[in-house]
């Protein structure tokens, strides 16, 4: 299981399964694999399913 951190908003970032403290910083991205970082963005929200 990959560990995804909350990026931006919890509701928008489905990729982040483990919802930890979402920082207010917008630059806060999912700290995991390259896919996770991409999945964090709304454009890649659909790709989050795989991860």
Swiss-Prot record:
Keywords: Chromosome, Developmental protein, Differentiation, DNA condensation, DNA-binding, Nucleosome core, Nucleus, Spermatogenesis. One of its GO terms (cellular component) is nucleosome. One of its GO terms (molecular function) is DNA binding. Testis. It comes from the Eukaryota. PROSITE patterns: PROTAMINE_P1. It is found in: Nucleus; Chromosome. Protamines substitute for histones in the chromatin of sperm during the haploid phase of spermatogenesis. They compact sperm DNA into a highly condensed, stable and inactive complex. This is Sperm protamine P1. It comes from Piliocolobus badius. The gene is PRM1.
């Amino acid at each position: 299981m990959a560990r995804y951190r909350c990026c931006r908003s919890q509701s928008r970032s489905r990729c982040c399964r483990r919802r930890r403290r979402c920082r207010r910083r917008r630059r806060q991205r999912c700290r995991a694999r390259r896919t996770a970082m991409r999945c964090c963005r709304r454009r890649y929200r659909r790709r989050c399913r795989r991860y």
